[in-house]
């Protein structure tokens, strides 16, 4: 029902969903869903088609899904953009060996392994590959304490945006707008009521 509210005035142009595996037992082991994540992703894709909303899919490639072939499943979902990211370890976020819920070190893969996944899916036209080097300083990561994390300085935290402005917090981290643009972080122009794209209205990712 909530999507219908956006249908008349076209205030919703794009929806992003994350799916790391189309095998639900793997998704569950990675913390996505309770064994039914694929069903909900497919439902989201159906809603996007029904309401003429562009679908974007994010996938993080790690040890658990490295050998999976997702070509058919991605084709069925028909996203306009499929962002495939090499799993990235950030100190303070997913490298806490004392807390299994926050320790993903065993899931890390090499650049060469990541490229085997990309090679397998190279015929998927909407694929956008992001190895680790494209990640560094090109993302803003926000932890549960509402602090931005550095992606190149060992997970260094900023002040919480509950205490300072977002602009001030960004000044404290290593985010680089040039690298953000370089990795194609600005890519989507908003559509007007006639389904035509408008200059200057963009989505960032």
Located regions from the model:
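Non-cysteine beta-strand/loop elements that form the S-adenosyl-L-methionine
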Residues: 3-23, 79-90
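Radical SAM enzyme [4Fe-4S]-AdoMet core and its adjacent flexible, acidic
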Residues: 24-202
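Short acidic active-site motifs
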Residues: 2-4, 69-70
């Amino acid at each position: 029902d909530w999507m219908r509210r956006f249908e008349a005035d076209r205030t919703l142009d794009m929806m992003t969903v994350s799916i790391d595996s189309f095998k639900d037992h793997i998704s569950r082991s990675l913390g996505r869903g309770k064994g039914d994540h694929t069903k909900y992703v497919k439902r989201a894709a159906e809603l996007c088609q029904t309401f003429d909303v562009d679908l974007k899919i994010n996938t993080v490639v790690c040890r658990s899904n490295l050998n999976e072939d997702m070509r058919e499943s991605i084709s069925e979902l028909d996203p306009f953009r499929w962002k495939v990211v090499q799993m990235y370890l950030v100190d303070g976020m997913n490298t806490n060996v004392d807390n299994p819920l926050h320790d993903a070190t065993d899931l890390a893969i090499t650049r060469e392994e990541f490229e085997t996944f990309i090679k397998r899916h190279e015929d998927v036209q909407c694929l956008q590959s992001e190895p680790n080097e494209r990640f560094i300083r090109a993302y803003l990561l926000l932890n549960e304490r509402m602090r931005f994390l550095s992606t190149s300085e060992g997970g260094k935290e900023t002040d919480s945006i509950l205490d300072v402005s977002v602009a001030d917090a960004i000044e404290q981290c290593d985010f680089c707008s040039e690298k953000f643009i370089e990795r194609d972080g600005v890519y989507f122009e908003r559509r007007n009521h006639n389904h035509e794209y408008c200059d200057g209205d963009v989505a960032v990712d």
